[in-house]
Amino acid sequence: RQPSNTTALWREVRGLIARRAGVLVLDDTTLDKPYAQPQGLVTYHWSGKHHRVVKGINLLTLLWTDGAHRLPCDFRVYDKPAGGETKNAHFRQMLAVAQRRGLSPAYVLFDSWYASLTNLKALRRLRWPFLTRLKANRLVTLERGQAAIPIASVEIPTAGRLVHLRGYGFVKVFRLVAPDGDTAHWVTNDPQMTEAQRAALALQGWEIESYHRGLKQCCGVERAQVRTTPAMRGHLLLAIRAF
């Protein structure tokens, strides 16, 4: 009989992971349940795929990758409407569990949704380098005693620039401008990171998108014909292990 938590997943992948190499990537995805009644783990979530609110299950994944291999090492289900933890709490819990399991990644990669001060400080306590994106309205200062301004207002060269993120400390920020004029701000606590390194890490961060796509298309994670929460959790675990 397999345990109903994520221990079974870890037992399966721990021998395949280089614990002091590679990167950890955290992101979430919505498992579509368009015909299910909102109950148990099925609630309303924003879907990046559909660009609207849909019925489904919100799955958070902690993925280990070295650029050539993708291995899920932990996951959580966001069920806050039923009294569960927030996404940010799940973020910190999975990182704490990863440390207890002996993981020491070269970097932790995640989206701006998880770039709260509490999460960034949790990573600082772990002494793990990170790379994330920040929203354009996050406040920074360039010199001591200077008034804080939105990061979007700061002049940032291609090689990046050190700024003081309000409430956290010094970080290095890179700005990318898309052909349509949209901008993205990438931030790391590694002051020595180059733009080439940032770009390479950003590509590794996209591995979790490939993982989520494979989980849905090849492992049937969205296809469980069950209603109870324990049965759904069991199906999620088996689908992830099948990957």
What is the predicted role of each segment?
Residues 1-2, 105:
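Alpha/propeptide regions of enzymes that mature by internal proteolysis
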Residues 2-69, 73, 79:
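Active-site-proximal, Lys/Arg-enriched surface segment
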